[in-house]
């Protein structure tokens, strides 16, 4: 009995705790300091950042079973962007896209609006 207990204790020490990933989880750039222990099936911390001209910077951070890094530049009129970043270390997604580039998004919106109004004026202006 004593030998079985010693063997069980040695086995528990040798195997150690299960390896789980810790990631920051949030749905906006203002509250991205919340960290969680991910489910055992999650191998990645994933950060998705979408910049839309009228809505600004939309950030989503979470645990993910799979993750494919990407960068997408949307059409010239919307001039939005979307990116996904992946990492595999504890709390590695802390600083990924936390800064909200709202000034840039607003500048793009103003430029798009100016171009649209100029085009409209040219189309609707009477011939000179």
Swiss-Prot record:
<feature type="disulfide bond">
    <location>
        <begin position="38"/>
        <end position="63"/>
    </location>
</feature>
<feature type="disulfide bond">
    <location>
        <begin position="23"/>
        <end position="45"/>
    </location>
</feature>
<protein>
    <recommendedName>
        <fullName>Lymphocyte antigen 6D</fullName>
    </recommendedName>
</protein>
<keyword id="KW-0325">Glycoprotein</keyword>
<dbReference type="InterPro" id="IPR018363">
    <property type="entry name" value="CD59_antigen_CS"/>
</dbReference>
<keyword id="KW-0472">Membrane</keyword>
<comment type="function">
    <text>May act as a specification marker at earliest stage specification of lymphocytes between B- and T-cell development. Marks the earliest stage of B-cell specification.</text>
</comment>
<dbReference type="GO" id="GO:0007155">
    <property type="term" value="P:cell adhesion"/>
</dbReference>
<keyword id="KW-0130">Cell adhesion</keyword>
<keyword id="KW-1003">Cell membrane</keyword>
<keyword id="KW-1015">Disulfide bond</keyword>
<keyword id="KW-0449">Lipoprotein</keyword>
<dbReference type="GO" id="GO:0035634">
    <property type="term" value="P:response to stilbenoid"/>
</dbReference>
<dbReference type="GO" id="GO:0009986">
    <property type="term" value="C:cell surface"/>
</dbReference>
<dbReference type="InterPro" id="IPR016054">
    <property type="entry name" value="LY6_UPA_recep-like"/>
</dbReference>
<feature type="signal peptide">
    <location>
        <begin position="1"/>
        <end position="20"/>
    </location>
</feature>
<feature type="disulfide bond">
    <location>
        <begin position="26"/>
        <end position="32"/>
    </location>
</feature>
<dbReference type="GO" id="GO:0098552">
    <property type="term" value="C:side of membrane"/>
</dbReference>
<dbReference type="GO" id="GO:0030098">
    <property type="term" value="P:lymphocyte differentiation"/>
</dbReference>
<dbReference type="InterPro" id="IPR045860">
    <property type="entry name" value="Snake_toxin-like_sf"/>
</dbReference>
<dbReference type="InterPro" id="IPR035076">
    <property type="entry name" value="Toxin/TOLIP"/>
</dbReference>
<dbReference type="GO" id="GO:0016020">
    <property type="term" value="C:membrane"/>
</dbReference>
<dbReference type="Pfam" id="PF00087">
    <property type="entry name" value="Toxin_TOLIP"/>
</dbReference>
<dbReference type="GO" id="GO:0005886">
    <property type="term" value="C:plasma membrane"/>
</dbReference>
<keyword id="KW-0732">Signal</keyword>
<dbReference type="InterPro" id="IPR042339">
    <property type="entry name" value="Ly6D"/>
</dbReference>
<keyword id="KW-0336">GPI-anchor</keyword>
<feature type="domain" description="UPAR/Ly6">
    <location>
        <begin position="21"/>
        <end position="108"/>
    </location>
</feature>
<feature type="lipid moiety-binding region" description="GPI-anchor amidated asparagine">
    <location>
        <position position="98"/>
    </location>
</feature>
<feature type="disulfide bond">
    <location>
        <begin position="67"/>
        <end position="86"/>
    </location>
</feature>
<dbReference type="GO" id="GO:0005576">
    <property type="term" value="C:extracellular region"/>
</dbReference>
<feature type="propeptide" description="Removed in mature form">
    <location>
        <begin position="99"/>
        <end position="128"/>
    </location>
</feature>
<feature type="disulfide bond">
    <location>
        <begin position="87"/>
        <end position="92"/>
    </location>
</feature>
């Amino acid at each position: 009995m004593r030998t079985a207990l010693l063997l069980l204790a040695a086995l528990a020490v040798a195997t150690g705790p299960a390896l789980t990933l810790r990631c920051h989880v949030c749905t906006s750039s203002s509250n991205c300091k919340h960290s969680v222990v991910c489910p055992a099936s999650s191998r990645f911390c994933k950060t998705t950042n979408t910049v839309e001209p009228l809505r600004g910077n939309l950030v989503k951070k979470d645990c993910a079973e799979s993750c494919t890094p990407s960068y997408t530049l949307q059409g010239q009129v919307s001039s939005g962007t979307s990116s996904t970043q992946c990492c595999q270390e504890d709390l590695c997604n802390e600083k990924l896209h936390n800064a909200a580039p709202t000034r840039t998004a607003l500048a793009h919106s103003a430029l798009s609006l100016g171009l649209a109004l100029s085009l409209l004026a040219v189309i609707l202006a009477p011939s000179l």
